[in-house]
Amino acid sequence: MEPAALIHLLDEYFTKFDELAVAHGMEKLKTIGDAYMCVGGLPETNRTHPIDACFMGLAMQAFAEQMKRQRDKFRLPSLELRVGVHTGPVMSGIVGKHKFTYDIWGDAVNIASRLETNGTPGRVNVSESTHHRVKELFVTEARGTIDAKNKGQLAMFFVNRIKPEFSADAEGRVPDERFQSRRSGVASASSQWPTIPAATS
C-alpha cells in the first residue's frame, strides 16, 4: 500500500475510534503508529469502565469487519485489528511544556499492551482483572496464559459478545433493558481502577 493511502486508511479507522471513545465514555490518550490507546475511569472517575471498555472493543472489531467487507468488494486492502483490555491502578497527569499531553503510567499500561500484542486479529483479549468485572454480562472464553515481566503468568480471556439473555440483537452487540439493570449492579461492585483498552492494526 502506498504511504498516502495507508495514512488515509488509518485516519478513517482512528476517526471512527475517536467517535466510539466518546460514545462509550473513554478518554483517548494517543496513537503510536498504527496503535490506538485510550482509558476508562479517567480523568473523571466512574465504575462502569470495565464494561464500557469491552463494549468499545467489540464495537471497534465490528467496524473493522464492516470496513473489510466494503473494501473487499473493490479488492482493496483492509486492516486487521487486535484489541487488549486490562483493569488496574495507574498514575495519570499532564506532562510537557509546549505540547501538553494527558498520559498514564504504571504496570497496568504494560499489561494492556501485552494483552494487545498477544491478542488475535478480530478478537477482544482481556485480563483476568477485567474478566472478573464483566463476566456476568458477556460471553467469554478462557485462552490460557502468557508470561508477564515481574508479574508471572497472566491469564487471558476473549470477550465474544453480550450474553444472549441480555442482548437485544442476534449478534450480541446491542444491550437490552435487563443488561442495563444488571450493569448498574455489576458496576457498583467494581473497583475504582481505570480500564485500559489498547488496539493495533
Ranges and model annotations:
Residues 24-32, 63-84, 145-146:
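Catalytic core regions of nucleotide second-messenger enzymes
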Residues 68, 86-87, 107-128:
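Catalytic/regulatory signature loops of cyclic-dinucleotide turnover enzymes
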Residues 39, 77-93:
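A short glycine-enriched loop-to-beta-strand structural element that forms part of the catalytic core
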Residues 73, 95-105:
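Short, surface-exposed loop/helix-turn segments at secondary-structure junctions
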Residues 17, 33, 60, 85, ...:
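Residue-level signature of catalytic and energy-coupling elements of molecular machines
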Residues 1-55:
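Catalytic NTP-binding/metal-coordinating core of nucleotidyl cyclase/transferase enzymes
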Residues 60-63, 67-70, 97, 118-122, ...:
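Conserved, well-folded catalytic cores of nucleic-acid-processing
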Residues 90-92, 118-201:
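Cytosolic regulatory/linker segments at or just downstream of nucleotide-handling modules
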